[in-house]
Amino acid sequence: MAGLSGVPIIILKEGSKRESGKDAQRKNILAAKAVAESIRTTLGPKGMDKMLIAGEEATITNDGATILREMDIEHPVAKMIVEVAKAQDDEIGDGTTTAVIIAGKLLEKAEGLLDQDVHPTVIVQGYKQAAARAQKVLSEMAVDVSADEATLSKIARTAMLGKGIEMAMDKLAALSVEAAQAIAGFEGKDIEENIKTVMIPGGRIDDSSIIYGIVLEKERTSLEMPRKIENAKIMLLEGTLEIKKLDTDAKVTITEAKNLSSFKEGEENVIKSQVDAIAAAGANVVFCEKGIGVTAQNYLARQGMLGVRRVSREDMKMLALATGARLVGDVMAVTAKDLGSAALVEERKVGKEKKMLFIEGCPQAKAVTIVLHGVSEQVLEEMERALDDSLNVVLDVIRSRKIVPGGGAPEMIVAENLRQYASTLEGREQLAVRAFADAVESIPLTLAENSGFDPLDSLAALRAKTGQGKAFGLDMATGQPSDMLAAGIVEPLKVKTQAIKSATEAATMVLRVDDVIAAKREELAPKPGQSPHDYTMPQMPMPHY
């Protein structure tokens, strides 16, 4: 046994690469910082846009969630940071850029602490203490508000600042407030999904409107059917209105012409009885999830009904929410109680050739549609992203009734409080708490830099004003401190608390990793000039700017 001393024991396959300790932590931190840096310049009302190129398609946006979603990221730690943005977007719908910037800055500050031989566990503990304190400070500074139209409009406008749609901000803010108020009273975890957005190129932005119902990119199944139905009674059929084909290889042999006629007549009678059952229930509009055969189309047209086939499952559910109809599986069992209602169902020509179906005037609509008009598809896509952000924050304020000032004011107050809190701590955790304060303060610093002001001068001015009884944030026009509440620059409390939570979770998760083992893979084969055993981790492709 003694003879084996000093002999290395190999447990990994040849070609595997292992990095541990500070080397692993530094590389992981570098990857996280690269992600944060890629979207840092998009923060704020004067943030820059990014051009994302995929093949022949280009997307121009400064929406953090969109940028990170479109980036082709391979590094596992970088992917973890992207998950921060996804969690923020899924939970709140806004604040993704803030969360990622704070996460990147927390890791940058942690790197400095690691160089001072502060143990990662101590840093993690300090960050957790600071995050808990920050949540408390944010909650204490929150302002209770009523969900009146003026307040909600301020929230909506703040969420859309810097999205490149300033010319449409007033209209979009009004649409988001109206849509949110229309569905806010209904129960459901993801109630925002009850709002559908339809984009129509052409026309003026002011032509955009809300339909208390649903708009489908569909048209009537037959031109013989009426184009317009008033006082519509709507049936939603999960099945089909056509003769089903047999699943087996069975064949029917007909030897006489009269038998063929009888066979076809029998098929038609089946369809006729189904259409008669629909008519008897009182329906005059039928939406079918599957097909509507030619025979059924003819019978529906004779009855003066409008039929639409191959409606997606998602649209069927939205129709049910909007019209109050129930999804019916057996057409022969339909009753008047299964039907929904709408003041109007109409096929309309949109643009030069496209047609859409408008189901509007639903008396108790639990789903609404926002119809956006714009000069181009790119403008419409950016309008939709801005509208999505504003809808989410408006709905959050309607639920929580709590807001905080914007312009970096909450971060300044949190940073000052954390520095005071750090002075009460005795261990090395105080270093981590101070680092956390610096990381949070990077938000107003970045806002100033992106607005073209000297970030250090702006930060110094904000620090001098913070704690004087008002919520001073950065005035993006002057670079000087300004009362954000008085200026109407406000955000939902939950956007800020979730950003702190998401960023802290991501940073602490990265700091806990002290060993990276990468197995040999074909795609990691050495490149020209690279050592055969230098299997470095994949680089993170960045988007084209």
Residue positions per predicted region:
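Extended amphipathic alpha-helical scaffolds
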Residues: 2-65, 71, 131-371, 375, ...
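Extended, low-charge hydrophobic alpha-helical regions
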Residues: 26, 72-74, 367-371, 375-545
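Residue-level signature of catalytic and energy-coupling elements of molecular machines
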Residues: 44, 93, 117, 176, ...
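Short hydrophobic alpha-helical segments that form membrane-spanning helices or hydrophobic packing faces
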Residues: 51-54, 99-103, 412-417, 495-496
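Active-site cofactor/substrate anionic-group-binding motifs, chiefly glycine-
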Residues: 57-91
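Alpha-helical transmembrane segments of multi-pass membrane proteins, especially transporters
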Residues: 96, 100-104, 120-128, 430-438, ...
